[in-house]
Amino acid sequence: MAKVLVLYYSMYGHIETMARAVAEGASKVDGAEVVVKRVPETMPPQLFEKAGGKTQTAPVATPQELADYDAIIFGTPTRFGNMSGQMRTFLDQTGGLWASGALYGKLASVFSSTGTGGGQEQTITSTWTTLAHHGMVIVPIGYAAQELFDVSQVRGGTPYGATTIAGGDGSRQPSQEELSIARYQGEYVAGLAVKLNG
C-alpha cells in the first residue's frame, strides 16, 4: 500500500476544492491510501475572518508526519510568484526531516491557484526548489491531460501541475476542466507511488 498525502493551504477555498479533486483522482488507484490535510493558518483568527477566509474541515498536518508518506502532493495559492506564507512557514519547520534525509526519494508534486494567471508556473517551480533540497523526486504532469490543449476558454493548468484562475476578486471557482486536470495529477502521482512502493 502506497501512502499519498494531499497537503494544501487555502484561504478562500480554491485550493481546497482543487485538493479534493487531486485526492479524488489519487483514490482511483488500487493500492493507494490517500489522506488530505492542510497546513496551519498563521494569520490571527480575526484578520483571517475579516479578509474573508473560508473555514475548512481538513485536519491540520504536522511537519514531522511528512515522513510517513510515499508521495506528497502540495497545493498552494500564489503569493507574488511564490508559495503562500503559510506553506513556507510549514516547510521551514522541516529542517529535522532534511537533516535525517526522511523525505529523500519520496515523490512530490505541486498544484496552485492565482488571481489572474500571473505566477502559476513560477509558484510551482519555486516550490520545487524546497522539495529538491529534501531529495524528493519531482513529478510534473506533462501534457498527458488532454484539457491542457484546450484554448477555447480561460483556464489554469500547466505541464508542471494543475492550476486554477480565481479572478482578481476570487469569485471564479475552479472549472470542470481545471478539476479534471487536478484529478489527473492525483491519479498519475498515486499510480507512480504504487508502482514504486506498493
UniProtKB/Swiss-Prot annotation:
FMN binds at residues 10-15, 78-80, 113-118, 133. It comes from the Bacteria. The modification N6-acetyllysine is found at K50. It catalyses: a quinone + NADH + H(+) = a quinol + NAD(+); a quinone + NADPH + H(+) = a quinol + NADP(+). NAD(+) binds at Y12, A51, D169. Disruption phenotype: Cells lacking this gene show no phenotypes, however, N-trichloromethyl-mercapto-4-cyclohexene-1,2-dicarboximide and 8-hydroxyquinoline significantly inhibit the growth of the wrbA knockout relative to the wild-type, which is consistent with a role for WrbA in protecting against environmental stressors through its quinone reductase activity. InterPro entries: Flavodoxin/NO_synth, Flavoprotein-like_sf, Flavoprotein_WrbA-like, FMN_Rdtase-like_dom, NQO. GO terms for biological process: response to oxidative stress. Keywords: Acetylation, Flavoprotein, FMN, NAD, Nucleotide-binding, Oxidoreductase. GO terms for cellular component: cytosol; membrane; protein-containing complex. One of its GO terms (molecular function) is NADH:ubiquinone reductase (non-electrogenic) activity. Substrate binds at W98. Belongs to the WrbA family. NCBIfam families: flav_wrbA (TIGR01755), PRK03767.1 (NF002999). FMN promotes WrbA association into tetramers, which are more thermoresistant than dimers or monomers, suggesting that multimerization underlies the FMN effect on WrbA thermostability. This is NAD(P)H dehydrogenase (quinone). It comes from Escherichia coli (strain K12). The lineage of its organism: Bacteria, Pseudomonadati, Pseudomonadota, Gammaproteobacteria, Enterobacterales.
